[in-house]
């Protein structure tokens, strides 16, 4: 059920005949209703009864929150009351501009009238809605660096930087006084002179150091060491001036014409700001001083890639899809072993199931034969059970025979020969080749060759 809002409650009050003396529909227009705000009975018999309060101003405020408009056309009673006759006869008339609030409106039509947004959430707290002109302060020295790099900027460009508004202030502070001199059009952005001075912080000094390194590392790559990027917070430093940050003029680099220029030229290294840590610099120096690991000579290895050869031999012996042929020795496929094991499991499961079913049926028949009071239907059931028992016994015997045949076939099969891990490429599978005995060849001496006749 949908909750009852202020609009539903107001519509129900207007339909009550007992309160029509103080609030009622207009007899000529079904979209207009009247109320007597200064009548004490309106506060007592209407507001306190339906809204649990007697504040007329709060009731009128709710009307405005839901979009009701007060009409300014006075009635005859109101004109006489304004003349000083009776104040309780003053009437106000309201209507809703959408036309959804009328005498015959139902709940579905009244649901279309929504309350205006007040900037307050459901928890009762006011939402923090920032205006588009709220901009935080920008470092003045950094803006000086940007202005020197980009050159003179027209007075129209700074207003486009911060959403088209020349007034910039933070929501947490009062807006500072901005004084714009007349010579700013030729000197650069006016935001630089209008920003309030700030105390140098660790982040500001780190940004200044990075800006100086980025500007000067192209011509002087070794001028700034890595120690400049780490700023000690205990030692306050002064804000660098634009002249100190700008450095010497940059020279345009031409095309490299010789190999010596390629050797002497080094690319700039820009260190981005990182969180300050006391032991970071010492750890970085230790890492730079550690020598690189040396590579042993090629002759120290027995094979060029011993680990690769071992992994290849192991993967060949464990290959599930293909057999490995090495020195006329064929290894069985691993997939056959898995299929054989699966078939053994299926046969064993079927054997156990049939044995259990046979035992249960036999037990049922033996218990049924001992009962004397059995009808003809029980005899027919016993006959079917005997037939099923005979079939299951035959199946059990066949499975036993199949299992015996399978075991005999397994005994004939040859087992897999494992591969040996080798560390020398010249000798592979020495244990397998040593077991192969070559045919004996007779040794003939020189004397036998001389006495043996030649056969042509």
From Swiss-Prot:
<dbReference type="GO" id="GO:0003700">
    <property type="term" value="F:DNA-binding transcription factor activity"/>
</dbReference>
<dbReference type="GO" id="GO:0000785">
    <property type="term" value="C:chromatin"/>
</dbReference>
<dbReference type="GO" id="GO:0007124">
    <property type="term" value="P:pseudohyphal growth"/>
</dbReference>
<feature type="region of interest" description="Disordered">
    <location>
        <begin position="229"/>
        <end position="299"/>
    </location>
</feature>
<feature type="compositionally biased region" description="Low complexity">
    <location>
        <begin position="253"/>
        <end position="267"/>
    </location>
</feature>
<keyword id="KW-0238">DNA-binding</keyword>
<dbReference type="GO" id="GO:0043565">
    <property type="term" value="F:sequence-specific DNA binding"/>
</dbReference>
<feature type="compositionally biased region" description="Low complexity">
    <location>
        <begin position="231"/>
        <end position="246"/>
    </location>
</feature>
<keyword id="KW-0539">Nucleus</keyword>
<dbReference type="InterPro" id="IPR000232">
    <property type="entry name" value="HSF_DNA-bd"/>
</dbReference>
<dbReference type="Pfam" id="PF00447">
    <property type="entry name" value="HSF_DNA-bind"/>
</dbReference>
<dbReference type="InterPro" id="IPR036388">
    <property type="entry name" value="WH-like_DNA-bd_sf"/>
</dbReference>
<dbReference type="GO" id="GO:0005634">
    <property type="term" value="C:nucleus"/>
</dbReference>
<comment type="similarity">
    <text>Belongs to the HSF family.</text>
</comment>
<dbReference type="InterPro" id="IPR036390">
    <property type="entry name" value="WH_DNA-bd_sf"/>
</dbReference>
<feature type="compositionally biased region" description="Low complexity">
    <location>
        <begin position="283"/>
        <end position="299"/>
    </location>
</feature>
<feature type="DNA-binding region">
    <location>
        <begin position="3"/>
        <end position="118"/>
    </location>
</feature>
<protein>
    <recommendedName>
        <fullName>Protein MGA1</fullName>
    </recommendedName>
</protein>
